[in-house]
Amino acid sequence: MSQLTHINAAGEAHMVDVSAKAETVREARAEAFVTMRSETLAMIIDGRHHKGDVFATARIAGIQAAKRTWDLIPLCHPLMLSKVEVNLQAEPEHNRVRIETLCRLTGKTGVEMEALTAASVAALTIYDMCKAVQKDMVIGPVRLLAKSGGKSGDFKVEADD
């Protein structure tokens, strides 16, 4: 079983020392969902939201969140991201929005937390913009889809049934 890397022998939280690690290309993809009533989703799709373009705002929020992950998650390293993508897709057949994010860099530590943070904040932004018309929207699941690069190797979520 793997050890927790952010806990020292005394059980105290600490930031991992990555100074001896090799720089490699690292990439991570994550997803989040926001489920809502069909009327709320139609308002977003049709561009009838009084606050403006929900998808554009959520996309920018997700990008900003990826860049600020180190400031939100206490033991994350500040990273020089080379790419952040936030894609939003309405899924009317499920009354939801699917958010997929991608983060990439060449560095000494992975970008999983950045991809997850981008997806989470984009979802929260959709909720924030639409809460005036629907307060019982559901955010989730939020999950890592894939990661590549680094010592721990590659990971890809199993295909959904």
From Swiss-Prot:
GO terms for MF: cyclic pyranopterin monophosphate synthase activity; identical protein binding
Effect after changing H77A: Complete loss of activity
Xref: CDD domains: MoaC_PE
Phenotype when changing E114A: Loss of activity
Effect upon mutating K67A: Reduced activity
Active site, renumbered: D128
One of the GO BP terms on file: Mo-molybdopterin cofactor biosynthetic process
Residues where substrate binds: L75, C76, H77, M113, E114
Keyword list, A-Z: Lyase, Molybdenum cofactor biosynthesis
Pathway entry: Cofactor biosynthesis; molybdopterin biosynthesis
Protein EC: 4.6.1.17
GO cellular component terms attached to this protein's record: protein-containing complex
Reactions listed under catalytic activity: (8S)-3',8-cyclo-7,8-dihydroguanosine 5'-triphosphate = cyclic pyranopterin phosphate + diphosphate
Induction behaviour: By anaerobiosis, repressed by the molybdenum cofactor.
Pfam families: MoaC
Reported function: Catalyzes the conversion of (8S)-3',8-cyclo-7,8-dihydroguanosine 5'-triphosphate to cyclic pyranopterin monophosphate (cPMP).
Subunit: Homohexamer; trimer of dimers.
Full protein name: Cyclic pyranopterin monophosphate synthase
